[in-house]
Amino acid sequence: MNKRRVKMRKEIRLSGFGGQGIILAGVILGRAAALYDNKEAVQTQSYGPEARGGASKSEVVISDEPIDFPKVIKPDILVCLSQQAYDKYKDDIKEGGVVLVDEDLVSTDKMPEVDVTMYKIPFTRIASEEIKLPIVANIVMLGALTRLTNIVSKESMEKAILDSVPKGTEEKNLLAFSKGYEVAKEL
């Protein structure tokens, strides 16, 4: 009997506003999948005309086969680090998807139209209070995302972070990743 292998295609949308490192987070996620987990990955991005404060979105498609369409249609995983992003994208998520929000920046009074698993984590507060560096909230988020979804391995993400962050910031970024990973263990 010939068994058909089930294809794995996961669509991830990371969203927030300019200056939060959304694009870098998408690049790191795609790099972890493609270079270190030996998966296929495509990363696309869009942002408003403002350098900081405007809407920002990074989408990553991860698959175990060649990716025939590089855009996210219905995300399996949605991350929102701003209220504007949550309000705009919450109803795009797939039934049974996973939503992560920064609980200090996003009110989830209005839930997505479909059943999802919602995680509310204070990414920015963890970065500010525990690492003393608010700019690494995106890396805290990647730690939680990795732990909660297993979309890529922890080791692959750590390698991709080291490849991607500015020289001299590696230790703080790995600490941020570790904090996010640990806080997700408690959920």
UniProtKB/Swiss-Prot annotation:
Gene3D superfamilies: Pyruvate-ferredoxin oxidoreductase, PFOR, domain III. Disulfide bonds: none annotated. Keywords: Oxidoreductase. It holds the Pfam family POR. It comes from the Archaea. GO terms for molecular function: 2-oxoglutarate synthase activity. InterPro entries: 2-oxoglutarate_synth_KorC, PorC_KorC, Pyrv/ketoisovalerate_OxRed_cat, Pyrv_flavodox_OxRed_cen. SUPFAM superfamilies: Pyruvate-ferredoxin oxidoreductase, PFOR, domain III (SSF53323). Its EC number is 1.2.7.3. It catalyses: 2 oxidized [2Fe-2S]-[ferredoxin] + 2-oxoglutarate + CoA = succinyl-CoA + 2 reduced [2Fe-2S]-[ferredoxin] + CO2 + H(+). Heterotetramer of the KorA, KorB, KorC and KorD subunits. This is 2-oxoglutarate synthase subunit KorC. The lineage of its organism: Archaea, Methanobacteriati, Methanobacteriota, Methanomada group, Methanococci.
